[in-house]
Design a protein with these regions (language model features):
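A short helix-loop-beta submotif of the ANL/AMP-binding
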Residues: 1-4, 124-126
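ATP-dependent adenylate-forming carboxylate-activation enzymes
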Residues: 3-19, 25, 44-48
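Alpha-helix N-cap/helix-start capping motif
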Residues: 9-10, 28-29, 50, 110, ...
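Conserved nucleotide-binding/hydrolysis micro-motifs of P-loop NTPases
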Residues: 11, 30-32, 135
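Short, charged, surface-exposed secondary-structure boundary motifs
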Residues: 15, 34-36, 138-140
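Residue-level signal for well-ordered alpha-helical positions
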Residues: 15-18, 37-38, 185
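Alpha-helical "lid/cap" subdomains adjacent to substrate-binding clefts that gate access
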Residues: 21-102
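Conserved AMP-binding/adenylate-forming
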Residues: 24, 64, 81, 85-196
Length: 196
């Protein structure tokens, strides 16, 4: 397993083209830039290319959101058209970004707009949107492979319990992946935990 860490956010494009990751965790801001870049490229394209891009996005949206997301089998012509766009339009976009080998791209740290999530999924970029914290060893909940709902942060991970504190609306999380303490910070640890 090869691990790469991009220490300079301004160099992410260069790093991606060099590393070409299969898995990459990132924040929504990265995907906002991918989305903006794709839309700029579409806008600069000739009329026929714009129509192809738009059809590819429509096809992907229908295939991914109506069939792949629900676990249902897509009609043959739609599946064939989606497969063609995977090898051409979606593939070209992913190669341009450096993510053509990507199997999963967890996204968290801030809200991801439904418009951008829908676009990414429609062009066959395998994002998994979720919620978590350093204190929870990352993921509390995320999109399942099938049955996720855009606009949500997915479903709870196994062995995790979540409730909302009625006094302050704070999210309370319990489970095996929750940290035991802040290192050498007993007061912060005490403040971070409820009695149960």
């Amino acid at each position: 397993v090869r691990i790469a860490i991009n220490r300079d956010p301004k160099a992410i494009r260069k790093t991606l083209l060099e590393v070409r990751p299969t898995l990459m965790c990132n924040v929504p801001r990265f995907w906002e830039k991918v989305y903006a870049g794709a839309n700029e490229r579409i806008a600069r394209s000739s009329g026929p290319l714009q129509r192809i891009f738009q059809d590819a996005i429509r096809t992907g949206r229908e295939y991914v959101l109506n069939y792949r997301r629900t676990g249902e089998k897509a009609p043959r012509t739609l599946a064939l058209k989606f497969g063609l766009y995977q090898k051409t339009v979606y593939g070209a976009l992913k190669r341009a970004v450096g993510i053509e080998h990507g199997n999963i791209f967890p996204v968290a740290g801030a809200p991801l707009s439904d418009e951008i999530a829908e676009f990414l999924l429609s062009v066959d970029i395998p994002i998994v949107y979720g919620y978590g914290l350093s204190e929870t060893s990352a993921t509390v909940c995320c999109y399942p492979t099938v049955g996720y709902t855009l606009g949500s942060i997915g479903t709870l991970m196994p062995d995790i319990d979540v409730r909302i504190d009625p006094e302050n609306n704070e999210i309370l999380v319990r489970g095996k992946t929750i940290m035991r303490e802040y290192y050498r910070k007993p007061e912060e640890t005490r403040c971070a935990f409820t009695p149960d």
